[in-house]
């Protein structure tokens, strides 16, 4: 239920609420465990009840969105939408596999610790689940944010934006996770003490926490790619990673080492499981990329000979990230040319951006009507964002992208982080008939207009055919 609600709030422009819910759950989990163990003396049963109650707090935090003025979600009759159930279940398969694998891993680890160690080690493992909940505030937050953005960029077939999103997620996520790991690793005795563990259980707990924190940065990478593959429809890859990182390799490693290493084999299994999962991702991606490029090379030669047109290709010198993206062969295959423009949130920069757009259209041989219409529309929509959309935006930004397809279709994509506003909904009935000429002409001559506001971004996609 919590994951479902977090998905709804992210889609409804409240992505920060999910992070607040995770942090609130983690804090409450620690506090409730302290009360259950130290004040009430409820032991393991109390720790389990405290964790369940912490999840209820997170659900309650997410539910506050439905009472806010920004909420646009409404209950509907689900019966007409039953046909979409299979695709929903397919997309959610990795999450389901994660839950099942974690359950089996927990059962196996509890049994192993009881056999080779003691009940104190089991108590340390239970405490470790609470620490994991706290650490997941970073890994889940980065992964879920990437899911939304990658879904948008994949639908737009924007390879550069997809790659930039993954790079940013990796860079920022690793910085946060490494800082968190360093702090918890150093203060592991104090962290364990918060849960009321002492004696043998505390000794097990310190080793467990320090060993576990080493795997969090790798877990972030794996989680980020699970989210990316889910958003791009690669359920097979997402499911494989989910099973691997959630427990398959960890359980196998623990079963092989616990008889000689004791409880340390269990604690180290988290790191080993995540590392093996990541290593296998890299190996498989490199092998499949090599096979794919070899196959694509022969096909491209045949296509060029048959049509006389140069075959579109992906990056010539592919990075490891390119190889791990697994973009379909049809991705951007119909693109002839594209160009991205950025403008600062001021009128002078907007005018300059419009001129650059006009110059690009002229360089690409765009017909006169569209070469006049597109720069004018860009200037009007960007000016509207500058004048009215950024009053409450700390770091305003406007991005423009033009795509010329092989059939002559021209696509305009504009994105800004201002207040939600669809320029196609602008009421021009009472306005000056000579104002917003570009937007007026767009309404009359476009083949299609799409608008959505997701994670605080206005996204407008305008498609103009050759005859527009």
Residues covered by each model-derived region:
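Conserved short strand/loop->alpha-helix "switch" segment adjacent to the catalytic nucleotide/phosphoryl-transfer site
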Residues: 357-379
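Flexible, glycine-/charge-rich segments associated with ATP-binding catalytic modules
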Residues: 300-341, 444-468
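Small-residue-rich hydrophobic transmembrane alpha-helices
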Residues: 2-18, 122-182, 186, 220-233, ...
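Short alpha-helical transmembrane segments in multi-pass integral membrane proteins
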Residues: 1, 28, 37-93, 150-215, ...
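Helix-terminus/linker motif at the lipid-water interface of multi-pass membrane proteins
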Residues: 35-42, 103-130, 134, 152, ...
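Short runs within selected transmembrane alpha-helices of multi-pass transporters and secretion channels
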Residues: 1-11, 18-29, 47-62, 140-143, ...
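Glycine-rich/acidic phosphate-handling loop/turn and adjacent ATP-lid/helix
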Residues: 411-436
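A conserved short beta-strand within the histidine kinase catalytic ATPase domain
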Residues: 395-403
């Amino acid at each position: 239920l919590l994951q479902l609600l977090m998905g709804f709030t992210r889609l409804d422009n409240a992505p920060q609420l999910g992070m607040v819910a995770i942090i609130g759950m983690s804090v409450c989990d620690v506090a409730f465990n302290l009360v259950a163990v130290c004040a009430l003396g409820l032991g393991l049963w109390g720790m389990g009840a405290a964790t369940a109650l912490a999840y209820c707090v997170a659900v309650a935090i997410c539910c506050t969105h439905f009472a806010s003025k920004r909420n646009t979600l409404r209950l509907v009759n689900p019966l007409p939408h039953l046909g979409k159930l299979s695709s929903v279940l397919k997309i959610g398969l990795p999450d389901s596999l994660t839950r099942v694998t974690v359950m089996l891993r927990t059962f196996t680890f509890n049994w192993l610790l009881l056999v080779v160690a003691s009940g104190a080690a089991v108590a340390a493992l239970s405490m470790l689940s609470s620490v994991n909940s706290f650490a997941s505030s970073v890994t889940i937050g980065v992964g879920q944010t990437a899911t939304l953005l990658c879904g948008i960029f994949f639908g737009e077939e924007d390879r550069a934006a997809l790659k930039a999103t993954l790079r940013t997620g990796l860079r920022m996520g690793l910085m946060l996770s490494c800082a968190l790991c360093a702090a918890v690793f150093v203060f592991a005795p104090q962290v364990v003490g918060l849960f009321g563990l002492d004696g043998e259980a505390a000794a097990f707990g310190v080793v467990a926490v320090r060993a576990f924190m080493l795997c969090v940065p790798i877990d972030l990478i794996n989680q980020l790619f699970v989210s990316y593959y889910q958003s791009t429809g690669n359920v097979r890859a997402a499911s494989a990673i989910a099973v691997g990182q959630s427990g398959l390799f960890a359980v196998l490693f623990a079963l092989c080492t616990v008889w000689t290493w004791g409880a340390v084999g269990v604690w180290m299994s988290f790191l080993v499981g995540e590392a093996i999962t990541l290593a296998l991702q890299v190996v498989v991606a490199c092998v499949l990329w090599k096979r794919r490029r070899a196959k694509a090379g022969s096909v491209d030669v045949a296509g060029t000979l048959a049509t006389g047109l140069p075959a579109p290709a992906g990056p010539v010198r592919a990075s490891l990230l390119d190889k791990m993206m697994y973009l379909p062969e049809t991705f951007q295959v119909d693109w002839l040319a594209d160009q991205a423009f950025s403008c600062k949130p001021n009128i002078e920069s907007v005018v300059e951006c419009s001129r650059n757009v006009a110059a690009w259209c002229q360089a690409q041989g765009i017909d006169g009507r569209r070469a006049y219409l597109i720069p004018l529309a860009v200037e009007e929509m960007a000016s509207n964002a500058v004048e009215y959309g950024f009053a409450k935006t700390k770091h305003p930004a406007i991005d423009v992208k033009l795509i010329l397809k092989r059939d002559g279709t021209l696509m305009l994509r504009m994105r800004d982080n201002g207040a939600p506003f669809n320029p196609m909904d602008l009421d021009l009935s009472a306005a000056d008939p000579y104002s917003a000429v570009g937007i007026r002409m767009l309404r009359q001559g476009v083949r299609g207009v799409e608008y959505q506001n997701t994670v605080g971004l206005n996204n407008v996609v305008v498609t103009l055919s050759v005859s527009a």
